[in-house]
Design a protein with these regions (language model features):
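Glycine- and small/polar-enriched repetitive beta-structure motifs of secreted/surface proteins
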Residues: 1-325, 333, 339
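Glycine-rich, low-complexity segments
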Residues: 340-346
Length: 346
């Protein structure tokens, strides 16, 4: 009903998740208000638009199966050799509001997905979208209903891939930008709320990740921020790493903060500041008591650390720094500057 199909359609063979039989596929592709322009492209989705050659928007709907008419509602392809694959997807809201611009891109069992570029794939990025089953009294009413449905479902799977060769599988509300980045989750344990940007980054089973750079590897991590290259975070949460590493360095502790080139943190909650710094001292370190020339026996927080140390160097490799421009301390746990020590001597 109300559909338009322009171009030659004589191809028979595999296209996306469908085996194309030209006559049958062409007939099934005449969905409500769908638009197809291009050679051997096929569109099975209400209000879907397909422009270019050898694209397919696939569904199992043939006018009689009521489980499939919502599939691919409002989906869009502009380019060639792209596929929005919903025919073999189990979810009847697969393909809803998917958009592809470019060449040789693919979505499968996903909705609310956006792809721009070439050779990108988004699979199994899907949540329920309460797409309308009737058009309402006007196009404006239908559009308003769709906007509300998308908003209430947080955009569906809402995964975006911009660039080339990016892959996302079992992700939600995730943006993948650049070249050859991969983000994966699992059924029922999707990787969600992530931003991965750069080249050759890999993330698996992550939540609330921000990774910007190249050749970073993150797995089983939450609330992690990486800006740099050659960093690896495994089974650790709340890490903040800013700065690149010449060779891959690994953080496996929670709450690590590493800022600078070639910085490393090996203790939970440790902080490494400055190029080449390593944080290796854990909480529980006891201060030296000058009155007894021995470690203090006082276990209060004044004498015994309750969190891991802040390192500004690496004494094992003769990397040491001064801390300059320090005001005189006031409280028992404040730093003392040289001026105060001179007063003690006087």
């Amino acid at each position: 009903t109300g559909s338009t199909m322009i171009g030659s359609h004589n191809y028979k063979g595999e296209l996306g998740d469908t085996t194309v039989d030209t006559a049958t596929t062409r007939k099934d592709a005449l969905n409500a208000y769908a638009t197809t322009v291009g050679a051997n492209s096929f569109t099975n989705g209400a209000f879907a638009t397909n422009t270019g050659a050898y694209n397919i928007i696939s569904s199992g709907y043939n006018g009689g199966r009521m489980a499939n008419p919502v599939k691919n509602l409002g989906s869009t392809i502009n380019g060639s050799l792209n596929s929005i694959e919903s025919k073999t997807a189990n979810n009847y809201y697969s393909g809803v509001a998917n958009s592809i611009v470019g060449t040789a891109n693919r979505t499968f069992n996903s909705n609310g997905s956006i792809i721009m570029g070439a050779g990108n794939e988004i699979t199994n990025s899907i949540t329920y979208i309460s797409a309308p089953t009737t058009g309402g009294s006007s196009p404006n009413e239908l559009a308003s209903t769709l906007r509300t449905a998308v908003k209430n479902s947080n955009g569906g799977g809402a995964t975006m891939a911009f660039g080339g060769g990016n892959k996302a599988d079992y992700t939600l509300r995730t943006s993948v930008i650049g070249i050859n980045n991969t983000v994966t989750g699992a059924s029922g344990a999707e990787s969600a709320d992530n931003l991965v940007m750069g080249v050759g980054n890999t993330a698996a089973n992550v939540q609330h990740l921000t990774a910007i750079g190249s050749k970073n590897t993150i797995s089983d991590a939450k609330n992690t921020v990486i800006v740099g290259d050659n960093r690896k975070v495994t089974s650790a949460n709340n890490a903040v790493i800013i700065g690149s590493s010449d060779a891959e360095t690994t953080a496996t502790v929670n709450d690590a903060v590493a800022i600078g080139h070639n910085t490393e943190v090996s203790k939970e909650g440790g902080v490494a500041l400055g190029s080449g710094s390593k944080a290796t001292v854990a909480a529980g370190a006891v201060g030296y008591d000058i009155s007894t020339n021995a470690p203090s026996t006082d276990t209060s927080a004044t004498w015994k650390s309750t969190a891991s140390a802040v390192s500004i160097g690496d004494v094992a490799n003769d990397v040491t720094r001064q801390i300059t421009s320090v005001a005189a301390g006031t409280n028992d746990t404040d730093a003392v500057n040289v001026s105060q020590l001179k007063r003690v001597q006087d």
